[in-house]
Amino acid sequence: NIHFGVREHAMAAICNGISLHGGLLPYCATFFVFSDYLKPAVRLSALMNQGVIYVLTHDSIGVGEDGPTHEPIEHLAMFRSTPNVSMYRPCDAKETAYAWISALKNRKTPSCLALTRQKLTNLEETSAESLKGGYVLKDFGKDFEMIIIASGSEVGLAYKVCEKLLEENICTRLVSM
């Protein structure tokens, strides 16, 4: 265990070096909002085909105790659009476990796991299908009138919305992406 302090770029660059040396599987963690500082090193691990794992915490659309300066708004789009980076934003413990296993097996590209600090409901319907990038979590009713797409901590919220809509006889399909 290496304590890097407040040095996100150095942390990610050192993990690249550990990966390049071989024999170890490096992973590191920081708040998702601070991923701006480690982005150049993540890009290099993608270019060098290094399987470093980046755990990015405190992901949420909600304002937490640290205030709006700690809301990762544009960061998900940044990593999703970076070539050769596997980006995971799991909605519960099962999807997190599948993402972690996939990241451990993926030794050719960096993996980023965006994890929330919020308490999440474990949904019975979640599955390894999340590794495809998106899947139908549940159909609420038979002939759905709309599709609701959500990812990460917002899937639980979308699930509750679908239940409420079904009470109003509006059938929906929920996709976890």
Please report, for each region that a protein language model flagged, where it lies by residue.
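Glycine-/acidic-rich phosphate or pyrophosphate-binding loops and their flanking alpha/beta elements
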Residues: 73-76, 81-84, 94-168, 173-175
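Thiamine diphosphate
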Residues: 1-114, 119
